[in-house]
UniProtKB/Swiss-Prot annotation:
It is found in: Nucleus; Chromosome; Chromosome, Centromere. Belongs to the SCC3 family. Keywords: Acetylation, Cell cycle, Cell division, Centromere, Chromosome, Chromosome partition, Meiosis, Mitosis, Nucleus, Phosphoprotein. PANTHER family: COHESIN SUBUNIT SA-2 (PTHR11199:SF3), STROMAL ANTIGEN (PTHR11199). Residues 36-48, 1071-1082 have a biased composition (Basic residues). It comes from Mus musculus (Mouse). This is Cohesin subunit SA-2. Residues 293-378 form the SCD domain. Residues 1-75, 1062-1087 are annotated as: Disordered.
Length: 1231
C-alpha cells in the first residue's frame, strides 16, 4: 500500500477563536426524519475506547480540550495559523497545503485532528457551538447534534451556504474543493484506517437527518461531495486492478523458464490489496448513499434535492460501469416531476452529460423509453430555463437515435420555434435543424462547390419553405428565421440560392415552386436579410438592441455589401416578374432599406438603380392597394438619402412621379366636382386611386410644395354639402389633409418660421377640425371613425403640450376644444364603443372568420376609447367628461377594464380632488338613470342598485391604502355625495325622505377610506342637512341615512388611529415594515380638524373655508395640468402612481365583510389580472410520487475486474413499477 508523503509539520495550539457564525434553527418536519438508517459496518461512529484514544498520536498523554484549541496550519507569508473554517472561508490559500497540514496533524494525533474536522463541519453550518474533546469521547453523534442544535441563533435564518456578500461568494466552491482535496490526499492510506472516514460519514449522516435546515443543507452537500471524491477513488482502483490483472495474465502466460514467480506473487498481493481497498470504498459509498442520498433527494428544501441530483449525475458520468444503470437512473426519472424548477433543471443537465457520450446510449435505452414522454412534456415547462434544457436534451436524444422520437414528439418541439422567449426558440431551432436539415445525401457531396439552384442548399431551402407553410403561422417568418439563425446561418444567408430559385427556370425533372411557395420563400428571404442587416431579433424577442462586438460589426458590413451587390441587380428582375402580385411586391420593395447605397456608385450600378426606379414607378401605376403604395413610398424614402450621390437621381424620379399624380388629381377633381353633373363610378374610381397614391406618398414625404390642402378641403366641403361623397374618397381626403397639417407643423418646429406661416397653419388646422367635427355625424360608420381618430390626434398635437420644451413661439397654434366639440366626441364614444357585442353567427362554416372579425372590431373600439381617454389624461377635454367613461367600468370590464382603470390612475395623479368629484359624478349619473327608469320607489335590493353599489366599492378600492394621501379627495367626495342626497326634497314634506336619500347607501362604500377624525367632521356636516325629525325616523325608507351615519360613527371612539385600519392580518403583514415611519405623521393628523361651514350650505366656498390652525385638508389649488408623460423625471415620484405602490390584493382584504355580504360577482376584487402561465407545471407531482415509495435500495456493487466479469449477473429491471413503488403509487400519472 502506498503511503502519502510525510511533511514535517509543527502544530501550535491556539486558543478558541471568538469568531462565530450565527444561523437560525429552522426546524422542519422532514419525512422520515426519525427513521434509523440502516448502516453498513463502516457507518458506525468507529471511535475507540478512552484507553485506545489515550495511546494514539501524542504518546499517551491526555489530549487538550477541544474547546481550548483550534487546529491550524503552518504560518505562510506572515499569516498566523488559522482555523480550517477561516481558511476555507477566505478561499485564498492553496487548498492542498491546507489539507496536507491537517493530514500531518492527523498523523500526530488523530483524535484532535478529527475534532477539528468535526468542528469545521459544525461551523460551516453556521452553528456557533463547539464540540469539545469531552463531548467527542463520551457522547454519541445524536447527542452531539442535539447539543449543537441548542447553540443555534434562532434570530437569524442565514448560514454560510446562503449568506450574501463578497466574503461568502466563493465559500461553497472552497468548501467543496476542500472535501475533494482531502479525499484525494488521503486516498492511499488514511481513508482505509477504519477510523477517519467512519467518523466523518457517521457525523454527516446524522447531521443530514437533522431538523435544522443549515445542518441538513451543509452536511448533505459535504456528503455528496465526499461521495463524488470516493467515486473517483473507486474508479482509479478499478483501473489499477485491470492493469494489475493484465500484468498478471501476461506474466503467467510466459514460458515456465521465463516466468518470474516472485513477480507473480507481488502482483497477486497487489491485486488482493486493491480488492480489499475497493471493498472498503464500496462500503463507504453504500453508507453515504443509503444514509444520506435516498433520504435527502426528496428533502423539503429544493436546494438539497438539487445537490443530490447534480451529484448522482456526476457519478453516473464519471463511473458509468458502476452507476449508469436503472438502479440509479430511476432517481433522476422520478425527480423530473419535482415541483421546483431548479431541481428539474438539475435532472436535465445531469442527463445531458450522459446522452452527450454516445458510448453510453445502450445503457440509457430503457430509461429513454420509460421517461421520454416526461422529457417531451418538459419542453412546455413553466420555467423557461427548464424548457430550454429539455429541448437540448431531446436534441441529444435525437442525435443518439432518431428512431426513439416519434413524429408527434418532434412536432411538439417544432412549434416552439415561434416562441416569444428567445432561448426556448433557439433551442427548438437547433432541434429542427438537426432533424430536418443536418443530413445530406451522399449524391449531394458532388454539389458542394456549386451555387444557386444546383447547390447543396437548394433542397434545404425548399424544406424550410415547406415547413413554414405546414406550420400555418405565415405571419411569423421572422421568428422562424431568428430561431434558426445561430445554427443554420450558412443556409439562411445563401441568398444566391434563394434568388436562383425565384428567377431561374427549374431543371429537367425538378418540380417548380408553386405560387404559395414562392410567396413564402420571398418572405423568408426578406426576414433573413433583415436579420443580417440589423443584427438583432424581431420585436418581442430580446430586451432591446445590444452593442455589437467588432467581429459582429464586420460581419454586418460584409453581409450588407453582399446583399447590395446581389439584389441591386436582381431586385429589378424580381419586381418585373412579380409586378402584379401585391403580396410579393410588398415584401420585395422592403429590401432597399437594407442596402449599402454607396455601392450603387462605387460598384457602377447606376443603370440597375434606374431599372429599380422604373419598376417602382410601374408598380405605383398598376396598384391601388395601400400596402403596396406605402411600400413604394418607403422605398423612395430609403433611396432619397442626401448623404449619397444617388440622391439627385432618385429625387428627380420622385418629383416627376408626384408632379404627374398631383396634376392628374387636380384635373380629375375639377371634372368630378362640376356642378349639375352626377359623377359616374369610373370618375370616382380614378379620383380615389390617384388620391390613394398621393396619400401614401404624403405619409413618408413632404409634399407641401404641391399645396394639396386646398383641393382636399374642397373635396371634403363638397361632401358635407351634398352628402353623397363616396366613403373611401372622404377617408383618404381626411388622411391626406391631416398629413399636410403635420408636415407644415414639422417644418415650422424644425426651422425658423414667419408669423404668416403660423397664421396659415392655424387657419388650416381650425378649418380642418371643423370639417372633422361635421363628419362625426356622417351616416357612414367608417367615415365617422376616421374623423374621430384624426380629430383626437389633432387635438392632442395642438394642445398646450405643444409649447413644452421651450417652444413658446407655437402658442398661437394651441387649440382647446369647445364644449360642443367635447360633447360630440363623448357622444361618439358612447354610441360606438360602449355597445353590446353581436354574438350570433350565421353559419358554422363562417364561425372562425366571424370570431376573427369580432376580435378585429373590439381592437378597433379599444383604440377609439384609448384615443379619447388620452385627451382626458392630458387635460385636453374637461375631466368631468370622464364620468361617462368611468360609469362603464363594471359593465364593460372584460373589454375595456384595463383602459378605464389606467385612466383613473392617471387622472388621480393630475388632480386627486377633481378625479374624486368625477367618480362621484359617474355614480350620480347612474343613480339618476335608475330613477328615470324605475322611479323613486325602486327596490334597493334590485340588481341595478346593487350594481351601482358594487361599482362604488370598486372605486373605493382604487384609492389604495394610504388614507393620508387621498384625504382631501375622499373628503370632497363625501361632501358632493351628501349634497346630492339632500338636493331634492320630498314634495310630500319633511316627514318623507329626500328623493335621492338612497344615494347615501352608495356613499357609505367610501366611509372606510375616511380617517377617524374626518369621519366625525363629515358626520357633523351631514347633520347640517338633517332635521330633528329625520334623526328620529326608523322606517325602512330611512335605512340609507341610518346606514351612512353608522358607517361614519364606526371606529370613531378608537384611541389609536390606523392609516390602514380594517385590513386583514395578511394585508397588515405586507405593509408592517413600511408602516413604522408613519408614527410621526399620526401625531400631526390627530391635531387636525375638518373646517366646516357655519350654515347648512352646499357651496364649495363654505366647505373649503379654513381656519388658521391645522385642518383636515380639503380641495387644494388645482395644480397646473400637465401631461404625466411630458413631465420632467423628477416630478414623476413613485407615490404619484398609486397603482404601483398599493397592490389591489391588499385592498381586497381591507373590507372582507363587504365581500361576504355580496357573494361572488364578475370580479371579486379590483386587482391586477393574474395571467396564468400557459406552459405546463409539474408542481405537486413529487409529493404524489414520494408517498408510499419503496426505498429498497441496493448495495453499491462496483463492477469486478475483467477476470470476474463473466460471473456478473444481469441487474433486474428497476423500472418495473413493482420494484420502485407500492400499490398506492401505481395509479399516479408520471406525466
Amino acid at each position: 500500500m502506498i503511503a502519502a508523503p510525510e511533511i514535517p509539520t509543527d502544530f501550535n495550539l491556539l486558543q478558541e477563536s471568538e469568531t462565530h457564525f450565527s444561523s437560525d434553527t429552522d426546524f422542519e418536519d422532514i419525512e422520515g426524519k426519525n427513521q434509523k438508517q440502516g448502516k453498513g459496518k463502516t457507518c458506525k461512529k468507529g471511535k475507540k475506547g478512552p484507553a485506545e484514544k489515550g495511546k494514539s498520536g501524542n504518546g499517551g498523554g491526555k489530549p487538550p480540550s477541544g474547546s481550548n484549541r483550534m487546529n491550524g496550519h503552518h504560518q505562510q507569508n506572515g499569516v498566523e495559523n488559522m482555523m480550517l473554517f477561516e481558511v476555507v472561508k477566505m478561499g485564498k490559500s492553496a487548498m492542498q497545503s491546507v489539507v496536507d497540514d491537517w493530514i500531518e496533524s492527523y498523523k500526530h494525533d488523530r483524535d484532535i485532528a478529527l475534532l477539528d474536522l468535526i468542528n469545521f463541519f459544525i461551523q460551516c453550518s453556521g452553528c456557533k457551538g463547539v464540540v469539545t474533546a469531552e463531548m467527542f469521547r463520551h457522547m454519541q453523534n445524536s447527542e452531539i447534534i442535539r447539543k449543537m442544535t441548542e447553540e443555534f441563533d434562532e434570530d437569524s435564518g442565514d448560514y454560510p451556504l446562503t449568506m450574501a456578500g463578497p466574503q461568502w461568494k466563493k465559500f461553497k466552491s472552497s468548501f467543496c474543493e476542500f472535501i475533494g482535496v482531502l479525499v484525494r490526499q488521503c486516498q492511499y492510506s488514511i481513508i482505509y484506517d477504519e477510523y477517519m472516514m467512519d467518523t466523518v460519514i457517521s457525523l454527516l449522516t446524522g447531521l443530514s437527518d437533522s431538523q435544522v435546515r443549515a445542518f441538513r443543507h451543509t452536511s448533505t452537500l459535504a456528503a455528496m461531495k465526499l461521495m463524488t471524491a470516493l467515486v473517483n477513488v473507486a474508479l482509479n482502483l478499478s483501473i489499477n486492478m485491470d492493469n494489475t490483472q493484465r500484468q498478471y495474465e501476461a506474466e503467467r502466460n510466459k514460458m515456465i523458464g521465463k516466468r518470474a514467480n516472485e513477480r507473480l506473487e507481488l502482483l497477486l498481493q497487489k491485486r488482493k490489496e486493491l480488492q480489499e481497498n475497493q471493498d472498503e470504498i464500496e462500503n463507504m459509498m453504500n453508507a453515504i448513499f443509503k444514509g444520506v442520498f435516498v433520504h435527502r433527494y426528496r428533502d423539503a428544501i429544493a436546494e438539497i434535492r438539487a445537490i443530490c441530483i447534480e451529484e448522482i449525475g456526476i457519478w453516473m458520468k464519471m463511473y458509468s460501469d458502476a452507476f449508469l444503470n436503472d438502479s440509479y437512473l430511476k432517481y433522476v426519472g422520478w425527480t423530473m416531476h419535482d415541483k421546483q424548477g431548479e431541481v428539474r433543471l438539475k435532472c436535465l443537465t445531469a442527463l445531458q452529460g450522459l446522452y452527450y457520450n454516445k458510448e453510453l446510449n445502450s445503457k440509457l435505452e430503457l430509461f429513454t423509453s420509460r421517461f421520454k414522454d416526461r422529457i417531451v412534456s418538459m419542453t412546455l415547462d413553466k420555467e423557461y430555463d427548464v424548457a430550454v434544457q429539455a429541448i437540448k436534451l431531446l436534441t441529444l436524444v435525437l442525435q443518439s437515435s432518431e428512431e426513439v422520437l416519434t413524429a408527434e414528439d418532434c412536432e411538439n418541439v417544432y412549434h416552439l420555434v415561434y416562441s416569444a422567449h428567445r432561448p426556448v426558440a433557439v433551442a427548438a431551432g437547433e432541434f429542427l435543424y438537426k432533424k430536418l436539415f443536418s443530413r445530406r445525401d451522399p449524391e449531394e457531396d458532388g454539389l458542394m462547390k456549386r451555387r444557386g439552384r444546383q447547390g447543396p442548399n437548394a433542397n434545404l431551402v425548399k424544406t424550410l419553405v415547406f415547413f413554414f407553410l405546414e406550420s400555418e403561422l405565415h405571419e411569423h417568418a421572422a421568428y422562424l428565421v431568428d430561431s434558426m439563425w445561430d445554427c443554420a446561418t450558412e443556409l439562411l444567408k445563401d441568398w444566391e440560392c434563394m434568388n436562383s430559385l425565384l428567377l431561374e427556370e427549374p431543371l429537367s425533372g425538378e418540380e417548380a415552386l408553386t405560387d404559395r411557395q414562392e410567396s413564402a420563400l420571398i418572405e423568408i428571404m426578406l426576414c433573413t436579410i433583415r436579420q443580417a442587416a440589423e443584427c438583432h431579433p424581431p420585436v418581442g424577442r430580446g430586451t432591446g438592441k445590444r452593442v455589437l462586438t467588432a467581429k459582429e460589426k464586420k460581419t454586418q458590413l460584409d453581409d450588407r455589401t453582399r446583399i447590395t451587390e446581389l439584389f441591386a441587380v436582381a431586385l429589378p428582375q424580381l419586381l418585373a416578374k412579380y409586378s402584379v402580385d401585391a403580396e410579393k411586391v410588398t415584401n420585395l420593395l422592403q429590401l432597399p432599406q437594407y442596402f449599402d447605397l454607396e455601392i450603387y456608385t462605387t460598384g457602377r450600378l447606376e443603370k440597375h438603380l434606374d431599372a429599380l426606379l422604373r419598376q417602382i414607378r410601374n408598380i405605383v401605376e398598376k396598384h391601388t392597394d395601400t400596402d403596396v403604395l406605402e411600400a413604394c413610398s418607403k422605398t423612395y424614402h430609403a433611396l432619397c438619402n442626401e448623404e449619397f450621390t444617388i440622391f439627385n437621381r432618385v429625387d428627380i424620379s420622385r418629383s416627376q412621379l408626384i408632379d404627374e399624380l398631383a396634376d392628374k388629381f387636380n384635373r380629375l377633381l375639377e371634372d368630378f366636382l362640376q356642378e349639375g353633373e352626377e359623377p359616374d363610378e369610373d370618375d370616382a374610381y380614378q379620383v380615389l386611386s390617384t388620391l390613394k397614391r398621393i396619400t401614401a406618398f404624403h405619409n413618408a414625404h413632404d409634399l407641401s410644395k404641391w399645396d394639396l390642402f386646398a383641393c382636399n378641403y374642397k373635396l371634403l366641403k363638397t361632401g358635407i354639402e351634398n352628402g353623397d361623397m363616396p366613403e373611401q374618397i372622404v377617408i383618404h381626403a381626411l388622411q391626406c389633409a391631416h398629413y399636410v397639417i403635420l408636415w407644415q407643423l414639422a417644418k415650422i418646429t424644425e426651422s425658423t418660421s414667419t408669423k404668416e406661416d403660423l397664421l396659415r397653419l392655424k387657419k388650416q388646422m381650425r378649418v380642418f377640425c371643423q370639417i372633422c367635427q361635421h363628419y362625426l355625424t356622417n351616416v357612414n360608420t367608417t367615415v365617422k371613425e376616421q374623423a374621430f381618430t384624426i380629430l383626437c390626434d389633432i387635438l392632442m398635437i395642438f394642445s398646450h403640450q405643444i409649447m413644452s420644451g421651450g417652444r413658446d413661439m407655437l402658442e398661437p397654434l394651441v387649440y382647446t376644444p369647445d364644449s360642443s366639440l367635447q360633447s360630440e366626441l363623448l357622444s361618439f364614444i358612447l354610441d360606438h364603443v360602449f355597445i353590446e357585442q353581436d354574438d350570433d353567427s350565421n353559419s358554422a362554416d363562417g364561425q372562425q372568420e366571424d370570431e376573427a372579425s369580432k376580435i378585429e372590431a373590439l381592437h378597433k373600439r379599444r383604440n377609439l376609447l384609448a384615443a379619447f381617454c388620452k385627451l382626458i389624461v392630458y387635460t385636453v377635454v374637461e375631466m368631468n367628461t370622464a364620468a361617462d367613461i368611468f360609469k362603464q367600468y363594471m359593465k364593460y370590464y372584460n373589454d375595456y377594464g384595463d383602459i378605464i382603470k389606467e385612466t383613473m390612475s392617471k387622472t388621480r395623479q393630475i388632480d386627486k380632488i377633481q378625479c374624486a368629484k368625477t367618480l362621484i359624478l359617474s355614480l350620480q349619473q347612474l343613480f339618476n338613470e335608475m330613477i328615470q327608469e324605475n322611479g323613486y320607489n325602486f327596490d334597493r335590493s334590485s340588481s341595478t342598485f346593487s350594481g351601482i353599489k358594487e361599482l362604488a366599492r370598486r372605486f373605493a378600492l382604487t384609492f389604495g391604502l394610504d388614507q393620508l394621501k387621498t384625504r382631501e379627495a375622499i373628503a370632497m367626495l363625501h361632501k358632493d355625495g351628501i349634497e346630492f342626497a339632500f338636493k331634492e326634497p320630498n314634495p310630500q314634506g319633511e316627514s318623507h325622505p329626500p328623493l335621492n336619500l338612497a344615494f347615501l347607501d352608495i356613499l357609505s362604500e367610501f366611509s372606510s377610506k375616511l380617517l377617524r377624525q374626518d369621519k366625525r367632521t363629515v358626520y357633523v356636516y351631514l347633520e347640517k342637512f338633517m332635521t330633528f325629525q329625520m334623526s328620529l325616523r326608523r322606517e325602512d325608507v330611512w335605512l340609507p341615512l341610518m346606514s351612512y351615519r353608522n358607517s361614519l360613527l364606526a371606529g370613531g371612539d378608537d384611541d389609536t388611529m390606523s392609516v390602514i385600519s380594517g385590513m386583514s392580518s395578511r394585508g397588515s403583514t405586507v405593509r408592517s415594515k413600511k408602516s413604522k415611519p408613519s408614527t410621526g405623521k399620526r401625531k400631526v393628523v390627530e391635531g387636525m380638524q375638518l373646517a366646516l361651514p357655519e350654515e347648512s350650505s352646499s357651496s364649495d366656498s363654505m366647505w373649503l373655508s379654513r381656519e388658521q390652525t391645522l385642518h383636515t385638508p380639503v380641495m387644494m389649488q388645482t395644480p397646473q395640468l400637465t401631461s404625466t408623460i411630458m413631465r420632467e423625471p423628477k416630478r414623476l415620484r413613485p407615490e404619484d402612481s398609486f397603482m404601483s405602490v398599493y397592490p389591489m390584493q391588499a385592498e381586497h382584504h381591507q373590507t372582507p365583510l363587504d365581500y361576504n355580504r355580496r357573494g361572488t360577482s364578475l370580479m371579486e376584487d379590483d386587482e391586477e389580472p393574474i395571467v396564468e402561465d400557459v406552459m405546463m407545471s409539474s408542481e405537486g407531482r413529487i409529493e404524489d410520487l414520494n408517498e408510499g415509495m419503496d426505498f429498497d435500495t441496493m448495495d453499491i456493487d462496483l463492477p469486478p475486474s475483467k477476470n470476474r466479469r463473466e460471473r456478473t449477473e444481469l441487474k433486474p429491471d428497476f423500472f418495473d413499477p413493482a420494484s420502485i413503488m407500492d400499490e398506492s403509487v401505481l395509479g399516479v400519472s408520471m406525466f
